[in-house]
């Protein structure tokens, strides 16, 4: 018995040392959230009273291309297009400043970080949650909710990723124009649109994502017509191109134009790169960021949005959704998405990769109405098991279509060819060809293009909740659309 006690003591000491070492290692990979504790609240305003803007003069806040896109499709402007009331914004700022001055023991900071025209909402950020609560008493605020709070700590930023100087010898597929991208475009019969000159020229695509690592340095993107970038998560960030490479891979599926290496589905389109996904946290405010990005895309005159993002639950369960919410009308992000076709924009959104988990279904905003939700298949045209399935709660077919995403050929943030899996990557493959089809059929409306793609997919006559309407045939869509135009 005398030897057992020292042995137990020794084992306990080893366990404590191991636990301490593990904790130290974990802590070393994290850092305190910059600036301390902050909160973001969303305020819904009751109306757009005393607006200096008029639907008769939309050029004051919408680009000519945006106005022309609507005119071409016969779409009228409405009250949702008007900016939020400047009077209410000034009153919010005045009241917040007054409350802040009354705080004696601490420095109170606050700022309006964004608005939504379509939902008539305002986002305010402050380190004083009581200030945000007090503002809810203002008579023009119809609804208020917290949509973000800073975490106690975040992962340390990743080291700078070096870009490769050139392609590896094995990246080239000699004699194959599309290189590694051949299967993903030929599966959709999109190469035939390219063969007659429709490669996305004249079309503008907004890519909504979480990061576009090294898109400013990777040689293949030097040929890409990038109109601009905008960060809705950290508007003043100087590291736009140093975040995750998820958006880099997404962009490459459309914009790459390196024959025998990788040619994407719309190499001649123009692009806006819009960051609206916060990689450090997962909270409802990202729906607001996504909405702000979509509204920006609208005002900039974008034709198509490619979004490989989806949500269903959040950190600290702040605003988690239930399956019954998959109706296209409940989640803010889904309500935004459902409005896009009515503004003349086609949204192509990923179905989500939760098919093998407890959720199993598509995520938000994949449940939206009048969009193309994209699932994933493998090279044998078999469903990828990770793909979220339908239907929506109100019985609509989802996903709408499927494309190669298990795996897809892409360009990483290092500038190398990789193969990655997910509906994140089948989505831009489809989005690029939507641009080519719309280029070929410029007189079609957003809704007509969406319907044409569904109707010419492989199982339009017998859709299901796994493949939706099936694998699109963009050449067939073009031929039928062309006949209908004549």
Annotate the PLM regions.
Residues 19-21:
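N-terminal signal peptide c-region/cleavage motif recognized by signal peptidases
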Residues 25-34, 112-116, 128-133, 156-207, ...:
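N-terminal domain-start motif of subtilase-like serine proteases
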Residues 27-163:
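Inhibitory N-terminal propeptides of secreted protease zymogens
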Residues 181, 191-230, 236-286, 300-303, ...:
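Subtilisin-like serine protease catalytic core
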Residues 209, 363-439, 443, 476:
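Extracellular S/T/G-rich loop segment that most often corresponds to the catalytic His/Ser-adjacent loop
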Residues 251, 274-278, 303, 361, ...:
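Hydrolase catalytic cores
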Residues 295-327, 350:
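Short acidic, glycine-rich surface-loop motifs adjacent to enzyme active sites
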Residues 327-344:
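Catalytic-core regions built around general acid/base machinery
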């Amino acid at each position: 018995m005398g030897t057992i006690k020292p042995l137990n003591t020794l084992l306990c000491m080893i366990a404590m040392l191991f636990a301490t070492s593990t904790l130290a290692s974990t802590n070393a990979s994290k850092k305190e959230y910059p600036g301390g504790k902050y909160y973001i609240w969303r305020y819904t305003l009751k109306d757009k009273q005393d607006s200096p803007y008029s639907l008769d003069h939309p050029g004051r806040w919408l680009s000519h291309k945006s106005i022309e896109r609507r005119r071409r499709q016969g779409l009228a402007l409405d009250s949702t297009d008007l900016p939020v009331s400047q009077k209410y914004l000034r009153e919010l700022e005045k009241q917040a400043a007054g409350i802040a001055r009354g705080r004696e023991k601490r420095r109170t900071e606050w700022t309006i970080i964004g608005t939504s025209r379509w939902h008539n909402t305002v986002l305010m950020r402050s380190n004083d949650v009581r200030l945000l609560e007090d503002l809810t008493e203002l008579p023009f605020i119809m609804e208020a909710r917290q949509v973000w709070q800073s975490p106690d700590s975040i992962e340390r930023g990743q080291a700078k990723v070096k870009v490769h100087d050139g392609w590896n010898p094995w990246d080239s597929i000699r004699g194959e124009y599309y290189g590694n991208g051949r299967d993903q475009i030929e599966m959709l019969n999109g190469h035939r649109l390219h063969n007659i000159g429709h490669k996305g020229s004249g079309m503008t695509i907004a890519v909504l994502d979480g990061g576009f690592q090294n898109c400013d340095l990777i040689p293949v993107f030097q040929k890409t017509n990038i109109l601009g970038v905008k960060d809705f998560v950290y508007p003043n960030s100087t590291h736009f191109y140093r975040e995750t490479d998820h958006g880099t891979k997404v962009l490459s599926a459309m914009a790459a134009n390196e024959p025998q290496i990788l040619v994407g589905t719309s190499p001649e389109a123009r692009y806006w790169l819009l960051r609206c996904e916060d990689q450090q946290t997962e909270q409802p405010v990202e729906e607001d960021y996504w909405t702000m990005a979509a509204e920006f895309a609208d005002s900039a005159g974008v034709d198509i949005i490619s979004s490989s993002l989806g949500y269903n639950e959040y950190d600290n369960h702040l605003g988690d959704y239930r399956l019954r919410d998959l109706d296209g009308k409940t989640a803010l992000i889904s309500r935004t998405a459902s409005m896009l076709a009515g503004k003349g924009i086609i949204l192509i959104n990923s179905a989500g990769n939760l098919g093998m988990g407890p959720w199993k279904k598509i995520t938000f905003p994949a449940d939206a109405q009048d969009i193309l939700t994209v699932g994933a298949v493998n090279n044998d045209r078999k469903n990828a098991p990770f793909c979220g399935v339908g239907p929506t709660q109100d019985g609509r077919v989802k996903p709408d279509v499927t494309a190669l995403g298990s795996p897809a050929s892409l360009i990483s943030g290092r500038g190398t060819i990789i193969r990655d899996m997910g509906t994140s990557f089948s989505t831009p493959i489809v989005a690029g060809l939507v641009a080519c089809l719309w280029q070929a059929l410029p007189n079609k409306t957003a809704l007509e293009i969406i319907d044409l793609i569904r109707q010419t997919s492989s199982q339009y006559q017998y859709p299901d909740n796994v493949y939706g309407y099936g694998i699109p045939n963009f050449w067939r869509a073009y031929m039928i659309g062309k006949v209908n135009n004549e």
